[in-house]
């Protein structure tokens, strides 16, 4: 992992990341993780760079070894009511609030920080630079992928397990063929256009 200079003077530092800003379906899922410096985890990196099998294995290890971890989410209705950016910020606030130990400082992937009562810093490419953010990205990704597998069993014709709700050619074709589900984000352009043309 490239060198990242941690903020000085803070004992408990949480990393926060989100997954699922781009999909047309389901919640945006965020995670917050406080790692244990005495219980290191090998192989932490951006969840997108890991195989599904490796992500699953690491997610279990993170949950066992971390001092604290939590998920936060914003549902499709909230995404539609707020917009995806604001809904992501809300989900991040929820993940931090759900931690059983409150951190002294929060490092957040990307370039925006939600409103928090704790000092925080945004880190561009944080999921590759900061172990805590990598851990959060892995837990969030595994959690959301599992949700898509559940949705896939409910609606097999949409093939959610394959595309995870992202606007792939397959998903757009299935959407046009079978229509909009309650779990679809109505404010997202392909879904909105379909609803307008009904």
Swiss-Prot record:
Its main location: cytoplasm. Transmembrane segments: none annotated. GO terms for cellular component: cytoplasm; ribonuclease H2 complex. One of its GO terms (biological process) is DNA replication, removal of RNA primer. Its cofactor is Mn(2+); Mg(2+). InterPro entries: RNase_HII, RNase_HII/HIII, RNase_HII/HIII_dom, RNaseH-like_sf, RNaseH_sf. PROSITE patterns: RNASE_H_2. It is found in: Cytoplasm. Manganese or magnesium. Binds 1 divalent metal ion per monomer in the absence of substrate. May bind a second metal ion after substrate binding. Its EC number is 3.1.26.4. Endonuclease that specifically degrades the RNA of RNA-DNA hybrids. This is Ribonuclease HII. It comes from Mannheimia succiniciproducens (strain KCTC 0769BP / MBEL55E). The gene is rnhB.
């Amino acid at each position: 992992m490239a060198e990242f200079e941690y903020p000085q003077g803070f004992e408990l530092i949480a990393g926060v990341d989100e997954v699922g800003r781009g999909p047309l379906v389901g919640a945006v899922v965020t995670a917050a993780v406080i790692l244990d410096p005495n219980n290191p985890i090998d192989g932490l990196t951006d969840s997108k760079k890991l195989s599904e099998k490796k992500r699953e294995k690491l997610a279990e290890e993170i949950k066992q070894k971390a001092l604290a971890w939590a998920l936060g989410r914003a549902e499709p209705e909230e995404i539609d009511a707020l917009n995806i950016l604001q809904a992501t910020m809300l989900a991040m606030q929820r993940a931090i609030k759900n931690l059983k130990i409150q951190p002294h400082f929060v490092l957040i992937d990307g370039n925006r920080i939600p409103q928090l009562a704790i000092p925080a810093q945004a880190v561009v490419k944080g999921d590759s630079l900061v172990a805590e953010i990598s851990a959060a990205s892995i837990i969030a990704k595994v959690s959301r992928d599992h949700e898509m597998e559940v949705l896939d069993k409910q609606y097999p014709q949409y093939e959610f397990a394959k595309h995870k709700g992202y606007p792939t050619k397959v998903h757009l074709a299935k959407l046009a063929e079978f229509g909009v589900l309650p779990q679809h984000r109505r404010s997202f352009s392909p879904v909105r256009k379909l609803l307008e043309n009904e």
